[in-house]
Each structure stands twice: as structure tokens, then as C-alpha cells.
């Protein structure tokens, strides 16, 4: 992307680089439902072409509905979070990495047994 600025002194070009590339899809390494609709989820850290890993965020979805987000706190064991499910019973969990430009990755990968958790009432 290039931006052209016109002034009395003549045109001046300002070159900028837009980030259109999404981060890599995270991989769910742990997802478990607990009582009172609590969800603990952990993912391996994603990578991005421009945003450092420490600045990526992760949106958490249950049955396609966003229920929260996680920040990368620099842990070597991945990114972990406690979220709250919206209903009891089976919930399909997916996670998407988001870079500083707002690009979202493809949905998380991982074994299907990891992605479906049960929400338990209080």
C-alpha cells in the first residue's frame, strides 16, 4: 500500500507496509470443562510474519460463539486461560490467533476429543 500526499511543495509519497497475513492456527493441547460452566483451555503458541508471539492474542469460541480471549504471557508451556461456557452439555471449543493488525488465523487444530468439552452446572 502506498499513500500519496499532495501539497504546495509537490507530491510526497509515503510507503507503508500493510499486514494482510494471518498468524498460524493454534493447536489446542488441553481443554476441559468443570463445574459452574468453567473451561480451562491451553494452546501452543502461534507464529506470525510481523507480530511477535508475545503480542498475539487468542479468541476462544464455544460452538462458534466467542466466549473470551487469552493473552500470551510468555509462558514456555503455551497460552492458558480460564473461560466460562454458555451452556451445559457438550461444547465444541476452537481458538483463533489474532495479530496486531487484527488478522485472525484459521480455527485451531487438535484431536477432536480435545475440542469437545462438557459444561457442568453449579
Predicted segments with their positions:
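Secretory targeting and sorting signals
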Residues: 1-15
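Extracellular fibronectin type III
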Residues: 102-120
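Surface-exposed, short loops/turns at beta-strand junctions within beta-sandwich domains
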Residues: 81-90
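Proline/serine/threonine-rich low-complexity linkers at boundaries of modular beta-sandwich domains
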Residues: 11-25
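Short beta-strand segments within Ig-like beta-sandwich modules, predominantly Fibronectin type-III
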Residues: 68-76
Amino acid at each position: 500500500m502506498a499513500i500519496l500526499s499532495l501539497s504546495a511543495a509537490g507530491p510526497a509519497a509515503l510507503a507503508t507496509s500493510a499486514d494482510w497475513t494471518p498468524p498460524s492456527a493454534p493447536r489446542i493441547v488441553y481443554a476441559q470443562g468443570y463445574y459452574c460452566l468453567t473451561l480451562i483451555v491451553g494452546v501452543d503458541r502461534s507464529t506470525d510474519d510481523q507480530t511477535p508471539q508475545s503480542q498475539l492474542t487468542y479468541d476462544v469460541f464455544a460452538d462458534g460463539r466467542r466466549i473470551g480471549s487469552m493473552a500470551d504471557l510468555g509462558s514456555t508451556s503455551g497460552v492458558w486461560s480460564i473461560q466460562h461456557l454458555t451452556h451445559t452439555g457438550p461444547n465444541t471449543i476452537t481458538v483463533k490467533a489474532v495479530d496486531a493488525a487484527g488478522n485472525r488465523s484459521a480455527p485451531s487444530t487438535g484431536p477432536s476429543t480435545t475440542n469437545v468439552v462438557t459444561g457442568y452446572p453449579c
